[in-house]
Amino acid sequence: MTVTRVGLVMHGGRAQAGDAARIVRGWCAERGVHCADIDVWRDDTRHSAREEVAAAGNPDLIVTLGGDGTFLRGARLAAENDALVLGVDLGRVGFLTEVPAAAVCEALEAVQEDRITVESRMLLTLRASRRLQVPTGMEALLRYGRGPLLPPPRVRTDCAEGDDWGIALHVTALNDIVLEKLARDRQVSVGVYLAGRLLASYSADALLVATPTGSTAYSFAAGGPVVSPRAEALIFTPVAPHMAFNRSVVAAPDEPIALRVLDRSGPAAVSVDGQLRGVLDPGDWIGVYAAPRRLKAVRLGPMDFYGRLRERMNLTDAPAAVADGQAAPLWPVTSAPPADLAHLTLPPGPGDTPSAS
């Protein structure tokens, strides 16, 4: 593809990010490509994704310089603008970022020359019984991270609304949508519905709905399953539930998951990819489902998700297995697979080149 406008989202607390940003700006200047910093905390206020991408000139490529948290900020903007997102890895335990800082110029050249794989990632969105907002006076108490809160989500004007179906909100999540308790001494009580049917009522510290991409984030820390990012699923996981059934449930992509705050519960916070977006009172609900749009992530080649899982999670082998030495690939990659395996995803063989997907 031909890149004409680049948006930069960077981790301001890392010197490496500033160095990488100068390299990106220099690359853009040499090729006459418009480059704009997207400062999500300019003027000490947060802006909607639509305002941020408009201020940056509606970039067709967003480059994030940081770890997975920075990538999530960039993904929110890319989803709004249907842009590509390229993650430059300056973090420590990242699954989302793709390129080491030293290779950022080579990565930009690969994008410009269309020598990339475009990986389509599932996103979540939601409907709610009412507009989400943070009550006056509660923002300072609930402020997440170092900067101010995002503005309340806008109502989607392209979707029908009604008393039964609630209102559709301009929200996209690459990792997860979480409903969590506000009071330290009181769990949140929530009825959980899958595909419109009550699964169970929970008292828990939090309840979350994750994408396969988000299965290695908060959901993983809460005991949820690791799911291939190429899969299509919604993953429901309770966090510290006060009940015997504490398992995750993996739903099909067309099965929405609704969370209703019960009358005996206190208020509950709604966070989207770690960003506080509103507070629900007893009787309120949110319905989480697969978003119609997808994230378009730049990959320079096939992603070795399971190799990265082993590396980033520091997975170790059982003592009995260590004696066998370093594990080799199950199947050789020196020749083409036989016909009965040709439809499977296997390690790349000789001469394989990335293609858009």
From Swiss-Prot:
It catalyses: NAD(+) + ATP = ADP + NADP(+) + H(+). It holds the Pfam family NAD_kinase. InterPro entries: ATP-NAD_kinase_N, ATP-NAD_kinase_PpnK-typ_C, NAD/diacylglycerol_kinase_sf, NADK. Keywords: ATP-binding, Cytoplasm, Kinase, NAD, NADP, Nucleotide-binding, Transferase. It is found in: Cytoplasm. NAD(+) binds at residues 68-69, 73, 175-176, 186, 205, 240, 275. Its cofactor is a divalent metal cation. The active site is at 68 (proton acceptor). GO terms for cellular component: cytoplasm. GO terms for biological process: NAD metabolic process; NADP biosynthetic process. One of its GO terms (molecular function) is NAD binding. Its EC number is 2.7.1.23. Involved in the regulation of the intracellular balance of NAD and NADP, and is a key enzyme in the biosynthesis of NADP. Catalyzes specifically the phosphorylation on 2'-hydroxyl of the adenosine moiety of NAD to yield NADP. Belongs to the NAD kinase family. This is NAD kinase 1. It comes from Streptomyces avermitilis (strain ATCC 31267 / DSM 46492 / JCM 5070 / NBRC 14893 / NCIMB 12804 / NRRL 8165 / MA-4680).
